[in-house]
């Protein structure tokens, strides 16, 4: 069973190797100001750790432009409407190739326009976060032509650039138990996921250059979720072999 001591021990191994493990934080499903979003932003301010917030453009309220304008906040596009277009036999997806690519391209372009309307030209990072972390290859290939230069899903990336001009940086630690009671997934699941990715990177079994991503969903959190985020940030920021990176640093604009 993985414990907080095990996480510290893994980071100690990074320190012994003279290396530093990079983390990043992505939070999904923002649509408007809520007490949960306020709590997330307050935690960000107190911790000093940057957060990338994935906004659903079709449902986004204009008030988000002001709420998410603070320091240490990057904004990503979370699909278009977070609507499932698969039939009942397949896993949920909005960006699957079982839809006409033209329809997907139109929606994503409309969503991108909505993001510019709310956040301005320089107020967000043109990175795509597919709903349910699912996107098929033909849709991925569309993204650079639509103006996106980043892609973020879940689990260790298979390629730094899944399409020319498109940088992938994924998340690896999902704190919500989606298949159970939809509360906190528990220390065993979350810490094991963190340690597994760190260990795989250190041992050359995963891309060492990919930051280890913490995935949260502020609207779904119970108290245990919030407690984990606080503790995870505390342990990592207090270790010399750990650092946190912003989405803007991880998804550079192509020159």
Residue positions per predicted region:
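Active-site beta->alpha N-cap acidic-glycine motif
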Residues: 2-74, 124-125, 214
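Alpha-helical scaffolding within the catalytic cores
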Residues: 7-10, 59-69, 152-171, 189-202
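Acidic-and-aromatic substrate-binding clefts and catalytic sites of carbohydrate-active enzymes
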Residues: 29-35, 54-65, 129-138, 159-160, ...
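Active-site beta-loop-alpha junctions enriched in small/polar residues
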Residues: 30, 56-58, 80-82, 156, ...
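Metal-dependent polysaccharide deacetylase catalytic core of the NodB/CE4 family, i.e.
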Residues: 50-141, 173-179, 214
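His/Asp/Glu-enriched short active-site or ligand-binding loop at hydrolase and phosphoryl-transfer sites
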Residues: 144-187, 244-248
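A conserved mid-domain beta-alpha-beta active-site/ligand-binding segment of alpha/beta enzyme cores
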Residues: 168-219, 224
């Amino acid at each position: 069973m993985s414990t907080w001591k095990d996480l510290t021990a893994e980071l100690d191994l990074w320190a012994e190797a003279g290396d530093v493990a990079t983390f990043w934080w992505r939070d999904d499903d923002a649509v408007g100001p809520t007490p949960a979003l306020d709590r997330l932003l307050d935690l960000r301010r107190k911790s000093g750790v940057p957060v990338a917030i994935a906004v659903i453009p079709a449902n986004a309220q204009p008030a988000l432009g002001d709420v998410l304008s603070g320091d240490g906040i990057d904004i990503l596009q979370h699909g278009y409407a977070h609507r499932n277009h698969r039939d009942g036999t397949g896993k949920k997806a909005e960006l699957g190739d079982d839809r006409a690519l033209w329809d997907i391209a139109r929606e994503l372009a409309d969503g991108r326009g909505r993001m510019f309307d709310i956040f301005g030209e320089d107020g967000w990072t043109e990175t795509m976060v597919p709903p349910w972390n699912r996107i098929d290859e033909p849709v991925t290939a569309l993204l650079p032509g639509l103006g996106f230069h980043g892609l973020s899903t879940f689990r260790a990336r298979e390629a730094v650039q899944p399409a020319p001009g498109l940088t992938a940086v994924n998340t690896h630690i999902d704190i919500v138990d989606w298949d159970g009671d939809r509360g906190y997934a528990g220390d065993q699941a979350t810490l094991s996921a963190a340690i597994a990715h760190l260990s795989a990177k250190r041992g050359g079994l995963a891309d060492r250059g990919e930051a280890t991503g913490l995935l949260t969903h502020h609207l779904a959190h119970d108290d245990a979720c919030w407690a984990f985020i606080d503790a995870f940030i505390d342990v990592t920021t207090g270790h010399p072999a750990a650092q946190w990176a912003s989405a803007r640093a991880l998804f550079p604009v192509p020159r």
